[in-house]
Amino acid sequence: MSSNSVKRAPTTATQRLKQDYLRIKKDPVPYICAEPLPSNILEWHYVVRGPEMTPYEGGYYHGKLIFPREFPFKPPSIYMITPNGRFKCNTRLCLSITDFHPDTWNPAWSVSTILTGLLSFMVEKGPTLGSIETSDFTKRQLAAQSLVFNLKDKVFCELFPEVVEEIKQKQKAQDELSSRPQALPLPDVVPDGETHHGQHGLPLLNGHAPGAGPHLAGLQQANRHHGLLGGALANLFVIVGFAAFAYTVKYVLRSIAQE
């Protein structure tokens, strides 16, 4: 924070926001990071990382807090900049911790308290002024699109270089994953060192049958020869049996004629 930001804000607000900044650096808010503008300590920007098991998972949501000169005796206004499916963009949000409800504001609440309350309301579905209704599918689409959207924001990139690098690494991993060819499943694959038997009773060593191709072809050819030989023998037995039967009948008839 520069000396210019100190001069522009009243002493009380400046001192309090400095304390809150040190506190949030020492004890970060889960899923959220925040930075004041170097030129104006009364304007803070934040980034919400979409929590797991929510439609916002994988998304990055940039917004800002505008503190009044009377802070902490008056509440700030809150805006969301990144399309998210929960709040309108660049619109003052009506929450109990914002300037819409000065009567419920507590001067003891810090920037950490404000951001925690914002995240809590974001993952809920209760309506309020500045909120919108969208499906979980739409929220997931916006979460995926938030990466590219935020990288186009100059203020976002200047205030959150670590988050920018995190997003770029995630994009790189996604690109590498999508460019990989789809692996085709291998039949009869077993773990290394194990021996199983696949089709035709062939042993499988380390997932493959040794010499399976030539051996299988030989078995198939032998089976064909065996079938032809069996059919020929069956026909021969029928012919021999019929000849024996004819000879027997002829012998019986001859014996009867002699008597």
Curated annotation (Swiss-Prot):
It is an enzyme of class 2 (transferase). Residues 1-226 are cytoplasmic. It catalyses: S-ubiquitinyl-[E1 ubiquitin-activating enzyme]-L-cysteine + [E2 ubiquitin-conjugating enzyme]-L-cysteine = [E1 ubiquitin-activating enzyme]-L-cysteine + S-ubiquitinyl-[E2 ubiquitin-conjugating enzyme]-L-cysteine. GO terms for cellular component: endoplasmic reticulum; endoplasmic reticulum membrane; nucleus. The keyword Membrane applies. SUPFAM superfamilies: UBC-like. Keywords: ATP-binding, Endoplasmic reticulum, Membrane, Nucleotide-binding, Transferase, Transmembrane, Transmembrane helix, Ubl conjugation pathway, Unfolded protein response. Residues 174-200 are annotated as: Disordered. Residues 248-259 are lumenal. One of its GO terms (biological process) is protein polyubiquitination. Signal peptide: none annotated. SMART domains: UBCc. Pfam families: UQ_con (PF00179). It is found in: Endoplasmic reticulum membrane. Pathway: Protein modification; protein ubiquitination. The keyword Nuclease does not apply. The chain crosses the membrane at residues 227-247. InterPro entries: Ub_conjugating_enzyme, UBQ-conjugat_E2_core, UBQ-conjugating_enzyme/RWD. Its EC number is 2.3.2.23. It is a single-pass type IV membrane protein. Residues 12-162 form the UBC core domain. GO terms for molecular function: ATP binding; ubiquitin conjugating enzyme activity. Belongs to the ubiquitin-conjugating enzyme family. Catalyzes the covalent attachment of ubiquitin to other proteins. Seems to function in the selective degradation of misfolded membrane proteins from the endoplasmic reticulum (ERAD). In cooperation with the GATOR2 complex, catalyzes 'Lys-6'-linked ubiquitination of NPRL2. This is Ubiquitin-conjugating enzyme E2 J2. It comes from Bos taurus. The gene is UBE2J2.
